[in-house]
């Protein structure tokens, strides 16, 4: 039985992760800490047998642990990951894993030195509709994927639980790392990579269309070049509706996602599946966490592969997108 603890116990931890940990018989949460002391009551209500620790050091060195589940704001991830790895613990971290390429390289090296698992929460791949997409692509239903067209529309940034006196960290550059590119773009990137392959280049434009009082972009447009074609991602917090749409073109057919419906049209067959919930329904996705936890535990106990390489590539692609946008949208090649 693995013993774990939360670093950060906001809504994502309480509503998105905790139900999944409670459902497992091979791992359990025994403690937590958060910069907001007010989260103590919420944690103890969710985990009556758990212990609340007043600091990260108190947690790391005052508990007997096998892993930590980091659900703190992204700007703190790199330092927290390194501290946990240095303490000999496996680490599961919410996305984005880190906020810079340099930090991505550093935590990957730290995991290798510590010989511990570092795994990112790439939970959208566990959504029923995304699992169905992956299965259809893997069985060759549309042949080689040429392009993915991804749309995420939101009307505003999500509100995050913060320490007293701290504003919403999602729109704080120091804590979020970036605007919607980090918040929703990270999900889009690992999904597109899973279906279309690893990009070799990227071009992007980051804009502020509505929330001009905030220092981060509320809209992002990315083109990703792969060996078979070019995929496009559009993300905005400045829409008039909340929705997601996906269109995937293959050499032998296409897959479309509208709401919770998946539609397949190919040379060999056609099909339609209802795969609730839709990607735009809810925010914490507790039902998508089970597969993430299973993969993490398998990596920690049975030497299964973690998704660290995928997470590092997400960081590299976001860096390329930021550099592209700063240069007017020029294409940036990913080396190596």
Label the predicted regions.
Residues 106-124, 144-147:
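Rossmann-fold dehydrogenase core element
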Residues 189-261, 290-304, 320, 336:
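Contiguous beta-strand/loop segments that form the cofactor/metal-binding neighborhood of enzyme cores
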Residues 54, 93, 118-120, 257:
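Hydrophobic residues in well-ordered beta-strands that form the structural core
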Residues 12, 280-294:
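Active-site loop of classical SDR/Rossmann-like NAD(P)-dependent oxidoreductases
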Residues 1-47:
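N-terminal Rossmann-like dinucleotide-binding module
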Residues 27, 67-72, 105, 116, ...:
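C-terminal helix-rich "cap/oligomerization" subdomain common to oxidoreductases
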Residues 50-110:
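Beta-loop-alpha module in the N-terminal Rossmann-like domain of NAD(P)-dependent dehydrogenases
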Residues 125-205, 210-212:
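Predominantly a Rossmann-like dinucleotide-binding segment in NAD(P)-dependent oxidoreductases
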């Amino acid at each position: 039985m693995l013993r774990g603890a939360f670093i950060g116990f906001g809504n994502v931890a309480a509503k998105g992760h905790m139900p999944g940990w409670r459902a497992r018989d091979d791992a359990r949460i025994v403690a937590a800490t958060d910069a907001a002391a007010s989260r103590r009551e919420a944690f103890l209500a969710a985990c009556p047998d758990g212990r609340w620790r007043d600091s990260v050091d108190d947690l790391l060195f005052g508990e007997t642990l096998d892993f930590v589940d980091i659900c703190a704001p992204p700007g703190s991830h790199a330092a927290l990951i390194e501290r946990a790895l240095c303490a000999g613990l496996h680490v599961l971290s919410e996305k984005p894993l880190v906020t810079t390429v340099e930090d991505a390289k550093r935590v990957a090296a730290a995991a290798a030195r510590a010989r511990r698992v570092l795994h990112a929460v790439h939970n959208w791949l566990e959504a029923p509709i995304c699992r169905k997409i992956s299965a259809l692509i893997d069985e060759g239903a549309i042949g080689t994927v040429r392009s993915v067209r991804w749309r995420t529309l939101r009307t505003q940034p999500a509100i995050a639980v913060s320490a007293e006196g701290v504003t919403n960290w999602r729109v704080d550059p120091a804590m979020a790392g970036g605007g919607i590119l980090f918040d929703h773009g990270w999900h889009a990137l690992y999904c597109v990579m899973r279906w279309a392959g690893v990009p070799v280049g990227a071009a992007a434009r980051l804009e502020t269309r509505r929330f001009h009082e905030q220092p981060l972009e509320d809209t992002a447009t990315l083109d990703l070049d792969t060996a078979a074609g070019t995929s496009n991602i559009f993300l905005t917090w400045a829409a008039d509706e909340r929705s997601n749409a996906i269109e995937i073109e293959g050499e032998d057919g296409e897959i479309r996602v509208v709401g919770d419906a998946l539609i397949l049209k190919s040379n060999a067959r056609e099909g339609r599946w209802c795969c609730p919930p839709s990607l735009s329904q809810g925010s914490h996705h507790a039902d998508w966490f089970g597969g993430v936890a299973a993969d993490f535990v398998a990596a920690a106990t049975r030497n299964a592969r973690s998704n660290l390489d995928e997470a590092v590539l997400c960081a590299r692609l976001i860096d390329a997108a930021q550099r592209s946008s700063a240069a007017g949208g020029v294409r940036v090649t990913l080396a190596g």
